[in-house]
């Protein structure tokens, strides 16, 4: 590096002349006699003692000794990694970056592009790690900064390959097929049609050819119920309908849309958006009257992809039933980076009403879907619903969305059907209900007449088959309407119709896997029940459930007006037997009861193949309790071991850590091979935090380390949950 210094003198008669009278400067460094400046560049490290002399105009001299030290230069800072190893979707990933030169320690940062949801860059180590369900190629620029503030960067492509995780998880069959929804999977090689503000969107939709892209002017509003016609397109020629904004102004593929992109910096009582800009870059579609729209897919519509749109309703009095609606057998649709929303106090029944096959909903944001209790025209509201009708349904992909619905955030079933939707992937979504929808809360928001919105649960399956629910965060559910604040319901139902009819004798809920999820702020956990319809009709089936590695945090029946129970397991007389249910490695802290059990043995017989293992559960005041019905209920005596022996055959209940069992329910009242702790502190969690917002891993000193029947710690694998849910909120 260039070097510069200057010698100085005082006294005598100027001007001065400088010279070396002893020693030598390193090669490349020189003393300027007239100025006393020392400068140059050298490649010779070492210590150089010299003696310098100054002579004034009268000939007087003075000398002084110095030592010039030359330090070997650090190598130039550089990123030495040349590529990132490929990743597989839904498989844990870890890759470390490397650099040389500069001064350690290094800090790493992402300077452009984005990693797929579920992946993160650890700044101190330069490690990219996590689990993503999103396949595609993600270009990123990564920068290393050394301790001296020097920077170096390099560009990489992280390729995530799709995986078909088929087979079984415990008793439950996983989806047999998964939708590939990357942009590269939906080519549109045709012409571009631009529709400016005031233009005729319906005409553009009618006239577009397969492979065309329809660009809607960013910032413009298009009012109407727009029909997306059937065109008989194919996998090589999609029709894309999108904002005219450049891709660089939108969230990158695989990154969730937020209202920021419509110029909205925040919404009350929702998580912060962290906007980098509030420029409106979306085109807006508005339904002007009561009904379903503004997006309506005609029967046979196929191969459409929607990108960068705000989809909503007008301010009319009345109900908007579905903002996106399918009239018949639509197929191959992708809803990508959209904001779908109702208005703060209206009735908007649902965002997307699913029907048809091969439909993906990705990276989108759903808000303000609600029905008004007591006086409303609709009874249930959801962000996404499906599972009704007489046409094939599924596969469906619902990943990386913010999902807000008052009654259920997602529901499959609850209507007349002769078919069952199958192969449903629900991953890495944030299910959310604003707490301000709860009457009595500060900032309460209900209907204009003051009535609250109807709230039931976060996820309900009444008609669905081969469902994977993985890596989601589910926030807020409370009771006070027809349910008790449950988070998730697996309740196959033959819905009742008029005049004593039953609408869905073929309805079933089978092969459901719920894993690596975080549930928070709820009144109760799971309701798993095979019950008859109001007209006494039985469903087809309800069985093969695998629930594992789930944390239920802040389960508070008092605050959320719920039952504060972990799980209800029940069968009503005449319904199919509940069987093949595994609940393993779950952590939850109910205050009332662990299990609410019911089966009428005279008509149903015991539930079969129940496996409840390796969980950490507080047992509550009434640990294992009957659902009612008198002595005919197998759980009538309300004693754990007695109830299990009567209600389940065969069953396994072992390896569980049971917290707070009172003297009324000693260890002898439970099956053997379980462990008991008088309180949460003696379990020795890393941080119990009252069962709300804690770290429920076990400390190394915990007496319960490795006590699961599989040799692992009981309770949910929090590291796996944190990895699966990284970036979800």
Question: What do the PLM-derived regions correspond to, one by one?
Answer:
Residues 236-239, 281-296, 317-327, 344-355, ...:
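Extracellular beta-strand/beta-solenoid scaffold signature
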Residues 10-14, 23, 100-102, 113:
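Short glycine/proline-centered coil/turn motifs in the loop regions
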Residues 182-187, 210-217, 223-284, 298-307, ...:
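Beta-solenoid repeat scaffold
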Residues 162-207, 218-220, 240, 245-249, ...:
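Right-handed parallel beta-helix/beta-solenoid
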Residues 675-729:
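C-terminal accessory segments
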Residues 536-539, 544-695:
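Predominantly extracellular beta-rich ligand-binding scaffolds that present long acidic/polar faces
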Residues 25-43, 115-133:
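Strand-loop-strand motifs at the edges of beta-sheets in extracellular beta-sandwich domains
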Residues 238, 302-313, 330-343, 357-372, ...:
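Right-handed parallel beta-helix
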């Amino acid at each position: 590096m260039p070097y510069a210094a200057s010698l100085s003198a005082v006294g005598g008669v100027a001007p001065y002349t400088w010279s070396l009278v002893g020693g030598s400067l390193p090669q490349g460094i020189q003393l300027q006699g007239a100025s006393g400046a020392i400068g140059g560049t050298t490649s010779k490290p070492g210590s150089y003692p010299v003696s310098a002399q100054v002579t004034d105009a009268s000939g007087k001299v003075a000398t002084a000794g110095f030592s010039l030290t030359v330090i070997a230069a650090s190598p130039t800072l550089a990123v030495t990694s040349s590529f990132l190893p490929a990743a597989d979707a839904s498989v844990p990933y870890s890759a470390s970056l490397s650099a040389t030169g500069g001064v350690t320690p290094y800090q790493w940062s992402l300077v452009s592009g984005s990693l797929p949801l579920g992946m993160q860059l650890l700044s101190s180590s330069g490690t990219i790690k996590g689990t993503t369900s999103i396949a595609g190629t993600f270009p990123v620029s990564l920068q290393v900064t050394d301790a001296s503030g020097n920077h170096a960067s390099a560009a990489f492509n992280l390729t995530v390959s799709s995986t078909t995780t088929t087979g079984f998880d415990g008793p439950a069959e996983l989806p047999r097929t998964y939708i590939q929804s990357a942009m590269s999977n939906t080519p549109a090689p045709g012409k571009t049609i631009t529709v400016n503000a005031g233009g005729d969107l319906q005409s553009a939709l009618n006239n577009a050819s397969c492979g065309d892209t329809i660009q809607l002017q960013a910032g413009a509003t298009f009012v109407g119920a727009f029909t997306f016609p059937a065109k008989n397109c194919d996998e090589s020629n999609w029709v894309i309908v999108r904002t005219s904004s450049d891709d660089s102004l939108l969230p990158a593929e695989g990154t969730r849309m937020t209202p920021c992109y419509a110029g909205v910096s925040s919404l009350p009582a929702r998580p912060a958006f962290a906007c980098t800009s509030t420029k409106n870059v979306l085109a807006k579609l508005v339904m002007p009257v009561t009904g379903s729209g503004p997006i309506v897919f005609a029967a046979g519509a196929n191969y459409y992809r929607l990108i960068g749109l705000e989809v909503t309703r007008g301010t009319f009095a009345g109900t908007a039933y579905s903002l996106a609606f399918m009239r018949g057998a639509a197929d191959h649709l992708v809803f990508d980076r959209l904001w779908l929303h109702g208005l703060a106090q209206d009735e908007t029944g649902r965002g997307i009403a699913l029907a048809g096959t091969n439909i993906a909903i990705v990276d989108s944001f759903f808000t303000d879907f609600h029905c008004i209790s007591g006086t409303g025209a609709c009874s249930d509201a959801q962000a996404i619903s499906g599972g009704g009708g007489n046409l094939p349904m599924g596969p469906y992909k619902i990943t990386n969305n913010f999902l807000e619905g008052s009654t259920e955030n997602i529901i499959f079933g609850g209507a007349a059907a002769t078919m069952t939707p199958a192969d449903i992937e629900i991953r890495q979504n944030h299910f959310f209900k604003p707490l301000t929808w709860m009457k009595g809360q500060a900032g309460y928001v209900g209907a204009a007449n003051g009535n609250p919105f109807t709230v039931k649960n976060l996820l309900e399956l009444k008609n669905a088959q081969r469902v994977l629910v993985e890596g989601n965060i589910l926030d807020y559910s409370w009771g006070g309407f027809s349910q008790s604040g449950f988070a998730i319901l697996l309740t196959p139902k033959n819905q009742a119709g008029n005049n004593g009819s039953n609408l869905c004798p073929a309805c079933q809920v089978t092969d459901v896997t719920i894993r690596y999820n975080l549930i928070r702020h709820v009144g109760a956990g799971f309701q798993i029940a095979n019950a008859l319809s109001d007209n006494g009709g039985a469903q087809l089936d309800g069985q093969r459930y695998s629930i594992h590695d789930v944390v239920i945090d802040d389960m508070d029946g008092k605050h959320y007006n719920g039952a504060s129970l972990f799980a209800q397991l029940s069968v009503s007389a005449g319904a199919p037997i509940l069987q093949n249910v595994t609940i393993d490695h779950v952590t939850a802290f109910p205050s009332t009861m662990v299990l609410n059990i019911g089966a009428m043995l005279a008509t149903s017989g015991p539930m079969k193949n129940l496996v409840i293992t390796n969980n950490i559960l507080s047992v509550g005041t009434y640990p294992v309790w009957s659902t009612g019905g008198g002595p005919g209920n197998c759980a009538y005596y309300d004693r754990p071991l007695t109830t299990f022996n009567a209600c389940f055959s065969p069953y396994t209940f072992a390896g569980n850590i049971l917290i707070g069992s009172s003297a009324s329910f000693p260890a002898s009242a439970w099956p053997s091979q379980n462990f008991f702790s008088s309180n949460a502190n003696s379990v020795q969690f890393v941080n119990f935090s009252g069962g709300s917002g804690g770290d429920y891993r076990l400390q190394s000193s915990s007496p319960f380390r490795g006590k699961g029947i599989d040799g692992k710690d009981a309770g949910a694998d929090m590291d796996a949950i944190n990895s699966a849910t990284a970036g979800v909120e």
